[in-house]
């Protein structure tokens, strides 16, 4: 829980700068893009050099947040920062809320039909208020297994977790990124990958 709180604070801190931009939407996009690039680079580099540990990730994030805030305040005139109140885009806000609730209920409060791998074609079961915290689809299980392998081995996700054999991973960037976020926030990917999935899919929507 402590790792989660610290991680969320450090992830949210750079977004405070969005309130300083005259065009706050553009500022938010800039900051969000910076965070994606930074965490992806941090994941790949630390895993490549075998130093993919929580202490390293935490230290890098603390340093990055400090440098970003210091650099932004130093160059505030160049970027025309403004302390005007943030105007909420209610349409985007409502869409985000609906998206989160819709995706959340699939895993944590699902009512409807479902089938399983060993069921016959068009054979369905009924569920009411069902809670299933694990990944649903094969690609999600695939991502979880490789990301956990990266965390456990402190290296790039290039080994088959079933037999420890090397293979070319075409989704190495995504799996490295997921592993870094999970390590940074102290998440158990087996039971909490769905939370990351909800967040990512909400952004895509």
For each of these PLM feature ranges, what is it?
Residues 98-205:
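Active-site lumenal/periplasmic loops and adjacent helix-entry segments of GT-C-fold
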């Amino acid at each position: 829980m402590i790792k989660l709180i610290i991680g969320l604070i450090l992830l949210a801190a750079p977004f405070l700068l969005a309130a300083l931009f005259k065009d706050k939407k553009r500022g938010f996009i800039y900051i969000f893009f910076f965070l994606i690039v930074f965490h992806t680079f941090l994941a790949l580099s630390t895993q490549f050099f075998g130093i993919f540990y929580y202490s390293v990730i935490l230290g890098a994030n603390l340093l990055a947040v400090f440098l970003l805030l210091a650099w932004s305040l130093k160059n505030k005139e160049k970027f025309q920062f403004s302390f005007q109140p943030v105007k909420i885009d209610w349409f985007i806000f409502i869409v985000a809320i609906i998206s989160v609730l819709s995706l959340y209920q699939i895993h944590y409060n699902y009512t409807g039909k479902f089938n399983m791998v060993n069921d016959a074609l068009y054979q369905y079961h009924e569920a009411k208020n069902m809670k299933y915290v694990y990944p649903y689809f094969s690609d999600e299980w695939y991502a979880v297994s490789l990301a956990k392998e990266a965390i456990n081995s402190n290296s790039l996700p290039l080994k088959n977790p079933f037999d420890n054999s090397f293979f070319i991973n075409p989704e190495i960037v995504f799996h490295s990124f997921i592993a870094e976020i999970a390590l940074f926030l102290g998440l158990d990917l087996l039971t909490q990958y769905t939370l990351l999935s909800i967040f990512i899919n909400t952004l895509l929507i």
